[in-house]
Amino acid sequence: MLSVGFNIAINATTQGVPKIIESLFPNLPNFIAHLLATIVLVIVLAKLVYKPYKQMIEKQRQKITEVLSDAIEKQTQANIKIKQANSLLEEAKTESVSIINTARVDAEIQKNKIIDNANLQAKNIQSYAQNSIKQEKIKAQLEIKNTIVNLAINSAEKILSKEIDKNTNKKLIEEFIKDLD
C-alpha cells in the first residue's frame, strides 16, 4: 500500500516537472541570452563601477585615517599643552604663595623696625624729658639756694650790723645749707 501511494506521488510529480521547467524556462535560447547579458552586465559593471567605487572607498578610508591621525595628533598636542598650562598654573600658584609669604615677612620686619624706632624715639623723648626735669630741678635748687643765701646774708647783716664781712658770712651760710641737705 505504501508503494502504491508512493508511485502515485512520484508519477504526479514527474508529470509536473516538465511543466515547472517549461514555466521557469519557457524559451531556452532566450534564457541563455539573458544569462549571458546578465554576466556581461555584471562584468562591465564590475569594471566600470566596482573598481571606481572601491577606489573611492579607499580614498575615503585614507581621508578618514588622515583625519583620525590628525585628530589624535591634535588631541596629543592639546593634552601636552594642558599639562604645560597646569604646570605653569602650579608654578604661578607656588610663586604667588612665595611672594605672599615674602611680603608678610617683609611687612613683619618693617613693622618691627617701625615699632623699634618708635620705642627708641619714646625712650629718647623720655630721657630728654628726665634730663630736662633734672636740669630744671638743679636750676631751681640753685636759685632757691642762692635766694636763701642772699636772704640769710641780708638777715645776718642786719642782725650783726656789719661786724662780719661778706665772705665769712657767705661761708657760714653755705655750711648751714650743706648741713640741711
Swiss-Prot record:
It is a single-pass membrane protein. CDD domains: ATP-synt_Fo_b. Keywords: ATP synthesis, Cell membrane, CF(0), Hydrogen ion transport, Ion transport, Membrane, Transmembrane, Transmembrane helix, Transport. The chain crosses the membrane at residues 24-44. Pfam families: ATP-synt_B. Its main location: membrane. GO terms for cellular component: plasma membrane; proton-transporting ATP synthase complex. Signal peptide: none annotated. It is found in: Cell membrane. The keyword Membrane applies. InterPro entries: ATP_synth_B-like_membr_sf, ATP_synth_b/b'su_bac/chlpt, ATP_synth_F0_bsu_bac, ATP_synthase_B_chain. One of its GO terms (molecular function) is proton-transporting ATP synthase activity, rotational mechanism. F(1)F(0) ATP synthase produces ATP from ADP in the presence of a proton or sodium gradient. F-type ATPases consist of two structural domains, F(1) containing the extramembraneous catalytic core and F(0) containing the membrane proton channel, linked together by a central stalk and a peripheral stalk. During catalysis, ATP synthesis in the catalytic domain of F(1) is coupled via a rotary mechanism of the central stalk subunits to proton translocation. Component of the F(0) channel, it forms part of the peripheral stalk, linking F(1) to F(0). Belongs to the ATPase B chain family. NCBIfam families: ATP_synt_b. PANTHER family: ATP SYNTHASE SUBUNIT B, ATP SYNTHASE SUBUNIT B', CHLOROPLASTIC. F-type ATPases have 2 components, F(1) - the catalytic core - and F(0) - the membrane proton channel. F(1) has five subunits: alpha(3), beta(3), gamma(1), delta(1), epsilon(1). F(0) has three main subunits: a(1), b(2) and c(10-14). The alpha and beta chains form an alternating ring which encloses part of the gamma chain. F(1) is attached to F(0) by a central stalk formed by the gamma and epsilon chains, while a peripheral stalk is formed by the delta and b chains. This is ATP synthase subunit b. It comes from Mycoplasma capricolum subsp. capricolum (strain California kid / ATCC 27343 / NCTC 10154). The lineage of its organism: Bacteria, Bacillati, Mycoplasmatota, Mollicutes, Mycoplasmataceae. The gene is atpF.
